[in-house]
Amino acid sequence: MIPYPTVEDASVALGRNLTWFETVWFDYSATKSNFHVYCHTILVLFLVFSLAPFPLVIVEWTGWFDQFKIQKKVKYSLSDMFQCYKEVMKLFLLVVGTLQIVSYPSIQMVGIRSGLPLPSLMEIVAQLVVYFLIEDYTNYWIHRWMHCKWGYEKIHRIHHEYTSPIGYASPYAHWAEILILGIPTFLGPAIAPGHIMTFWLWISLRQFEAIETHSGYDFPWSVTKLIPFYGGPEYHDYHHYVGGQSQSNFASVFTYCDYIYGTDKGYRIHKKLLHHQIKEEAEEKRVRKHD
């Protein structure tokens, strides 16, 4: 709860006038408890899980962009995708939503705030960079562990039921995997705590990234292609394509860990063979044309 009865009192306490965004935030949250504000995290995640993958459903259903589909032989029906969404929503209600509620004391403990002032753009960007780097590194090692015999058979194999991933399948996993992977997601905000709005932006962007990575489509116009060391859909799709025996492409977001620790060798060999195959097919077409 914001400890100021009016906007004027808040302005006096801050020593300046509130920005437009701060005024809107004050009007909305001033009478709400910190716990009530934090519970909005559940709504944020529900909207992201439900709405962000939906355009990919249209893309898959219509076939308008099949030229960009990575595994072209695999096609999902509307029924398949709706079934995946239902399973994800069960996980959301039973695991994700519950986890958000019971984790509130840890939010208080690390110092994630919901009052004024709101963070500056530079503060938000700096914290998001830290969060992505911390999550990526810790997620890499947890993901590698999940591909050991016990971790895969007992937990991670459920996520790999989709050998050709789709957007709604990004959070499709064993309940234990959801809980375990919550650790790297929360670790960044725990180390560099910020505002609850930054926290919401962080978990939203992380889910957007996961949905794109599991989209099954490699769109050439994606702005994420401009991000250095970004893995993306084609990179992660190989991991799902290989399946349970995969010891390659564990990266959550960036590819540097796979490169440093040598877990992208299979992928690089695959890319070379694919490139060689494409060249041979192009040469065969050229020869046939001249004949």
From Swiss-Prot:
Its EC number is 1.14.18.11, 1.14.18.9. Residues 128-263 form the Fatty acid hydroxylase domain. A motif (Histidine box-3) lies at residues 235-241. It catalyses: 4,4-dimethyl-5alpha-cholest-7-en-3beta-ol + 6 Fe(II)-[cytochrome b5] + 3 O2 + 5 H(+) = 4alpha-carboxy-4beta-methyl-5alpha-cholest-7-ene-3beta-ol + 6 Fe(III)-[cytochrome b5] + 4 H2O; 24-methylidenelophenol + 6 Fe(II)-[cytochrome b5] + 3 O2 + 5 H(+) = 4alpha-carboxy-ergosta-7,24(24(1))-dien-3beta-ol + 6 Fe(III)-[cytochrome b5] + 4 H2O. It is a multi-pass membrane protein. A motif (Histidine box-1) lies at residues 143-147. One of its GO terms (biological process) is sterol biosynthetic process. It comes from the Eukaryota. Disruption phenotype: The double mutant smo1-1 smo1-3 shows no obvious phenotype. GO terms for molecular function: C-4 methylsterol oxidase activity; iron ion binding. The chain crosses the membrane at residues 41-61, 92-112, 114-134, 178-198. Expressed at low levels in leaves, roots, siliques and flowers. A motif (Histidine box-2) lies at residues 156-160. Its cofactor is Fe cation. The histidine box domains may contain the active site and/or be involved in metal ion binding. Requires a membrane-bound cytochrome b5 as an obligatory electron carrier from NAD(P)H to SMO. Belongs to the sterol desaturase family. This is Methylsterol monooxygenase 1-3. The gene is SMO1-3.
